[in-house]
């Protein structure tokens, strides 16, 4: 970033929650870096959407940085039990991706039943935000149960619970 001209287009891309470790990205530091170097920020929130933030709104919301995150993308296949995904960004970014992304151009639309499933799941999460907290509570319960049984687990604040199998 330091070597690029300030006016050059730059994009910092990160996972919101890393799928193998359950670690949450350092979004405050990333957005500050983006501010320093005039870069945009993109968060792939496949594992943060439905889990972190107010009512499961995701990693950017978790940190209060939704307004400093230029592109948020996620999947319906994890917390919404469907297929497909989403991208939230300024309209010109969405139009660019829609017209220039080969995988998007050559793929089929989400089936109506899958869209309805995702929408129904979103409505449940919105009506019952306590379910997100329950997921966190159940994750903590699982961690404690594994630890009591001597299973070595990696520290994580998300429902992703990495554990070591060694020679089991």
Describe each PLM feature range.
Residues 1-43:
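Active-site phosphate-binding strand-loop segment of PLP-dependent enzymes
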Residues 10, 73, 107-108, 151-157:
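Short beta-strand
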Residues 17-21, 48-51, 104-105, 162-163:
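Short, small-residue-enriched loops and turns at beta-alpha junctions
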Residues 83, 101-110:
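A short glycine-threonine-serine/GTX helix/turn-capping micro-motif
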Residues 109-128, 134, 138-143, 147-148:
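Structural motif of enzymes handling amino- and sulfur-group chemistry
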Residues 133-140, 147-168:
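Conserved PLP-binding catalytic core of the aspartate aminotransferase-like
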């Amino acid at each position: 970033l330091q070597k690029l001209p300030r006016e050059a287009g730059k994009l910092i891309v990160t996972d919101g929650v890393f799928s193998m470790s359950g670690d949450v990205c350092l979004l405050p530091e990333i957005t500050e870096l983006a501010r320093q170097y005039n870069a945009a920020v993109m968060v792939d929130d496949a594992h943060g959407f439905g889990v972190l933030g107010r009512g499961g709104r995701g990693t950017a919301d978790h940190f209060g940085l939704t307004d400093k995150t230029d592109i948020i993308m996620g999947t319906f296949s994890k917390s919404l039990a469907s297929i497909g995904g989403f991208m939230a960004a300024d309209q010109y970014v969405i139009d660019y991706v829609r017209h220039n992304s080969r995988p998007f151009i050559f793929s089929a639309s989400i089936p109506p039943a899958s869209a309805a499933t995702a929408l129904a799941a979103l409505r449940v999460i919105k009506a019952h935000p306590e379910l997100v907290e329950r997921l966190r509570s159940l994750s903590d319960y699982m961690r404690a149960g594994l630890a009591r049984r001597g299973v070595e687990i990696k520290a994580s604040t998300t429902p992703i619970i990495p554990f070591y199998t060694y020679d089991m």
